Amino acid sequence: MVSHKKNDRPRPLWILKIHKRLSLFEFKRYATGIGKDDGQDISWVLKGNAKNNVYQVTVETMENCETDECKKVIWVPDELAESTGTMFEDFKEDQPQESVSSISNNEANWGSSVNELDENYEKMQKEETFDPYDSDSDTSEDSDFDEDFEDSDKTMCSGQS
């Protein structure tokens, strides 16, 4: 039997616009203030390998393609923003790096020490169940299909019908 699971996360096709750049340290302060209800997905940063900076970008998603509903704001690590080529270079020239001081007090976790920020960030990484880099997180079929396929493959290989 094939069972299906519904993935409610949008699947980005490409970056349309780069809005903001934060250092990874400053993002750790900001990330604690981003709620799941505001539509800004941070799983790409939490599960990615951000080295220096992270970027707030608008992406076009596979869902409702070519409509306003397909545009989502997400945060991505530097390597994904850099992959936009000319758009990234233009952004880098035109936009200074944001700092936490340019973000409202409500969005930043101001009272945290560096160790506390790192601990909170690691906790957020562990609590994030969706991994956008894992192909299994993006499929519409779960392991029941894989087991059925493996069973039928074994039957075919053994010559049984």
UniProtKB/Swiss-Prot annotation:
Comp. bias intervals (Basic and acidic residues): 120-129
Taxonomy of the source species: Eukaryota, Metazoa, Ecdysozoa, Nematoda, Chromadorea
GO biological process: establishment of meiotic sister chromatid cohesion; maintenance of meiotic sister chromatid cohesion; negative regulation of protein localization to nucleus; positive regulation of protein localization to nucleus
Functional note: Involved in sister chromatid cohesion during mitosis and meiosis. In association with the gsp-2 phosphatase, it both restricts the localization and antagonizes the function of the air-2 kinase during meiosis I and mitosis to promote chromatid cohesion and spindle attachment. This in turn, drives germ cell immortality. Furthermore, may play a role in ensuring the timely assembly of the synaptonemal complex during prophase I of meiosis.
UniProt note: phenotype after gene disruption: RNAi-mediated knockdown results in embryonic lethality in 57% of animals, and of the surviving progeny, there is a 6% increase in the number of males (Him phenotype). Defective sister chromatid cohesion during meiosis and mitosis. Mis-localized air-2 in oocytes at the diakinesis phase of prophase I in meiosis. Impaired meiotic DNA double-strand break repair as evidenced by increased rad-51 positive nuclei throughout late pachytene to early diplotene in gonads, and impaired number of crossover recombination events between chromatids.
CC per GO annotation: condensed chromosome; nucleus
Nucleus among keywords: yes
Keywords from the UniProt entry: Chromosome, Nucleus
Assembly notes: Interacts with gsp-1 and gsp-2; the interaction is direct.
Coarse class of the protein's main subcellular location: nucleus
Region of interest called Disordered, as start-end residue ranges on this chain: 85-161
Taxonomic source organism: Caenorhabditis elegans
Record flagged with keyword Calcium: no
Localization per record: Chromosome; Nucleus
Biased composition (Polar residues): 97-115
Composition-biased stretches (Acidic residues): 130-151
Name the UniProt record assigns to this protein: Long arms of the bivalent protein 1
Chain span(s) of sequence motif PP1 binding motif: 72-75
GO molecular function: protein phosphatase 1 binding
